Design a protein with these regions (language model features):
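Metal-dependent polysaccharide deacetylase catalytic core of the NodB/CE4 family, i.e.
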Residues: 52-137, 199, 208-210
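A structural signal for the main folded, soluble domain(s) of proteins
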Residues: 26-27, 34, 38-40, 69-74, ...
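Active-site-adjacent pocket scaffolds in enzyme catalytic domains
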Residues: 133-212
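Alpha-helical packing segments of well-folded alpha/beta enzyme cores
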Residues: 31-35, 112-116, 120, 142
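Active-site beta->alpha N-cap acidic-glycine motif
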Residues: 1-70
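Short loop/turn motifs at secondary-structure junctions
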Residues: 3, 43-44, 125-127, 150
């Protein structure tokens, strides 16, 4: 009997990101090597899903380049729409409301995904293959953008969790409802991301501890 795969993924982002600060600091970048060393000790190769502020942080860049060079981990893409270029003020105060990327127009969504992908690939000189959506907000448009750009794995789905009541833009409809999504890995259907299909994008849902 094969043992189940165990994958470690880390949202690699600024300090206290949810405190609505107007300036995001990245002091935590100085301490990531400790966790990397722990992973290596037990033979794990973590995936550092990297947000904009960390992608331009020199300490993290040096750290991640070393991890990649030694083949001991991977850098992937993670995107929070309110502080990832190009800037587009959706709500009048995006730093306060932290809108979901899927609340933006197709054009703005595309520009932001392209920018982050190119920034990461140019900085780390490696193809971006893995992705997790900021605030777990994922939809069909987003999935098709990832496929177009050659991503192979997404890990945005939180099975049985409904994020509709977690507001982004005040006039929006909240996050993604994953209540009826699979709890196992599957290649997504490009027309309905809650169903298995024939696309090249593998969805690896998160492990969730449910509240009873």
């Amino acid at each position: 009997m094969k043992k189940p795969a165990f994958i470690i993924t880390i949202d690699t982002e600024g300090d206290n990101l949810w405190q609505n600060h107007r300036v995001i600091k990245t002091e935590n970048a100085r301490y990531l090597a400790r966790f990397q060393a722990l992973c290596e000790r037990f033979g794990f190769k973590p995936v550092w899903l990297t947000n904009y502020e960390m992608a331009i942080e020199p300490v993290f860049i040096e750290f991640a380049k070393d991890v990649i060079a030694r083949g001991q981990g991977e850098v992937g893409m993670h995107l929070h729409a309110w502080n990832s270029p190009p800037e587009h003020d959706l709500t009048g105060d995006d730093w306060r409301w932290q809108p979901y990327l899927i609340e933006f127009s197709d054009e703005i969504m595309r520009e932001k995904v392209l920018f982050m992908t190119h920034l990461l690939e140019e900085t780390f000189q490696t193809k971006m293959l893995s992705h997790r959506a900021g605030r777990w907000a994922f939809d069909r448009r987003y999935a098709n953008l990832l496929i177009e750009l050659g991503y192979q794995v997404d890990c945005s789905v939180t099975p049985r969790v409904n994020w509709r009541n977690a507001k982004g833009a005040p006039q929006g409809h909240g996050g993604t409802n994953y209540q009826h999504f699979p709890d196992h890995a599957y290649f997504i259907d490009t027309e309905d991301i809650s169903r298995p299909g024939k696309s090249p994008l593998l969805e690896v849902p998160m492990s969730i501890q449910y509240k009873h």
